[in-house]
Every structure is written in structure tokens, then in C-alpha cells.
Amino acid sequence: MTRSSNDNDFSQTPQPNRSSNVWIWIAAGTGCGCLGLFVLTIIAAIALPTFLNQANKGRQAEAKQYVSSMLKAQQAYRIEKPTFTNSLPELDLGIQPETMNYIYKIVPQPDKSKSVMVTAQSKITGLKSYTGAVFAIKKGADVTTVTAICESNLSTSRPPAMPAPPKDEKSLVQCPSGSQKL
């Protein structure tokens, strides 16, 4: 391939038809930029609710974990003593009664030797609330425990009610209306 001597000569004035193409490229680039911005806006509108939902799932995981830990600690406490405890510090878990997302409570039941309820009450709109229960059930001469965690079906600051106690250790705990068992 041979080069002409004019290929590297930049001293020549541009041809008129070539300079008018610059405005076409600028206009096309601006249009593409607007189209790109429009597409990004649509993607953001789709992704933002998903992102916020993931953040809420993380916050709800805190409540599920804390309620589960409180139930396990109540089971251990009940093995050592003839009743459940009403005191969060007695469980020795290091769980604070209140976090940024939830308020945690141990709700005493009429017969502290048979059952206990723990709750995670949502403080933030969009989060579900939780109720956990431990039931002590006689099995011959021994006592065994059955646990359940109920999650509210909708986001609410009201934890589900206490589930009904199972008839025996093989029966499933039924969560109250408006909640589901985890």
C-alpha cells in the first residue's frame, strides 16, 4: 500500500462536507446520551425496590436469629430449672432489649413452668414482626420442649399472638391467623 504525500499533510483546510458531518455526530451522540439516561432510569426504577427488599430481609434476619437464640436459651434454662425465665439478662445472650430495627421482649405466660413467649416487635415500617414460643410437654416421667417461630404475614409492628400449645411432642405448633411458621 502506497501513501500519497498528502496523507500526513494537516495544513490543508477541511473539506466543507466533512465539517458538516461533525454536527451530525454531535446530534447523534446527544440523542444516544438521552436514550442511555432513559434506559438507566428504567433500570433504577426496577432495581430500587429489589434493593430495598434485600435490605429489609437483612434486618428481618436479625430478628429471626435473636428470637431463635432466645428460644434455645429458654430451653436450656428450663432444663436447669423448673420454670422459664422472664428476664432477658438471665438468658446471658448479650442481646439488647432494643436495637435500631426491633424491640425484644420475653412475655410471661400464666404458668411459667409450661410455656414462654418471646417477641421481636418491628420499629421500622416495612419489616415483619416475630413471636417465638417454647412449650414444656410431659413425656412419661420426663419433660421435653417444643419450639416454634411465627412470622407475621405482612409488615407490622404488632408481633403475632401466642401459638396454641401442642397436644404432645409429636404435634406441630400452629401459628395464629395472620402469621406463618418458620
Question: Model-derived features: where do they sit?
Answer:
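Low-complexity, intrinsically disordered extramembrane tails and loops of integral membrane proteins
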Residues: M1-I24
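Selective for proline/serine-rich intrinsically disordered segments
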Residues: Q12-P14, A47, A161-A164
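Residue-identity detector for glutamine
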Residues: Q12-Q15, Q54, Q60, Q65, ...
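Amphipathic alpha-helical segments typified by the pilin-like N-terminal helix
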Residues: R18-Y66, L71-A76
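Periplasmic/extracellular, small/polar-rich flexible segments of pilin-like filament-forming proteins
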Residues: I79-L182
